[in-house]
Swiss-Prot record:
It comes from Carboxydothermus hydrogenoformans (strain ATCC BAA-161 / DSM 6008 / Z-2901). Homodimer. It comes from the Bacteria. It holds the Pfam family Aminotran_1_2. This is Histidinol-phosphate aminotransferase 1. Its cofactor is pyridoxal 5'-phosphate. CDD domains: AAT_like. NCBIfam families: hisC. One of its GO terms (molecular function) is pyridoxal phosphate binding. Pathway: Amino-acid biosynthesis; L-histidine biosynthesis; L-histidine from 5-phospho-alpha-D-ribose 1-diphosphate: step 7/9. Keywords: Amino-acid biosynthesis, Aminotransferase, Histidine biosynthesis, Pyridoxal phosphate, Transferase. It is an enzyme of class 2 (transferase).
Amino acid sequence: MNKPRYFKEAFAQLKPYEPHLVSYEIKLDANENPYLFPKSLLEEIFSKIGTRDFPLYPDPLAGRLRIRLSEKLGVLPENIVLGNGSDELILCLYLAFGGYGRIALSFSPSFVMYRHHAFVTQTEFFEVSYRDDFSLDLDETKKAIEKYQPHLVFLANPNNPTGTLVDIETIKKLLAYDHLLVVDEAYVEFSGVSAIDLLKKYQNLVILRTFSKARALAGLRLGYLVASVDVVKEIIKVKNPYNVNVFSQIAGEVVLANEEVFQGEIKEIVAERERLYNQLASLGLKPVKSHANFILVEFGEKAKKIHQELINHGILVRYLGGALANYLRITVGTPEENRQLLKKLGEIL
């Protein structure tokens, strides 16, 4: 049966992003911060919300939070745009610089929303495959840039789902072309490597970041973009006017004012990542060296079966399928969560 004419034929094959919602005891599938949000900070957030905050629209540019971020990053407030998660800002980049007749380039495997938003905005999309060890092939990337002449290039660094990292010198080489290079630093706190200082020299660089990972605000949806003033102006033209709610804005301010709390958690997660990597390798598995808060692990042809076995025991990890059908992506949990995961894997294997 044909659908009415107001449905888009092009969207018939488009699949929505659907997380696997099943019951669990240990959740290691979405790269979230495994620690409980500090109660003292939650109380501080509530204490800063007034009775007039809810009936009034929020600041459309999240002015106070914008200033706090600018002070932390050493840029102007005018270099920053806040978003309802960095996912929204990816869409805004496509709305401002992509669209019909425009071209975007990214890498494979990488974050699925680059491709998704390209499709939604009718932006032609191409990918360069990572090498077998998931490192970036600069020669192939240059060939693709010269062939397709993209307007937008998306680079997740560290990359999701592999956890691998591209060095700053390589990023400089990618900035030598006439395109907007978007470096998605969602996991930067776990790698310690950022391209943000390059903004002083390169007007065609965009840095994407989020409060969802290291800063434990995934449930509030808060991200930000740092770029030249001219690029920021274009993003503001296309974003929704009141895109970040007042609760998220205040939470962001409180989190930034209490960075030491999260720095301690970051150190623990990084230490656990290294321990988990070594323990997975000792089980005879092939983990990929990670610079994020997760580890991609090769399980061979049994990956999907093992994924289901873990679900049956209340442990969620991410099965990726496709070209990564032999892999599972495992978020670094608390020491106890990781211990239980390793124990169960030892029994399954």
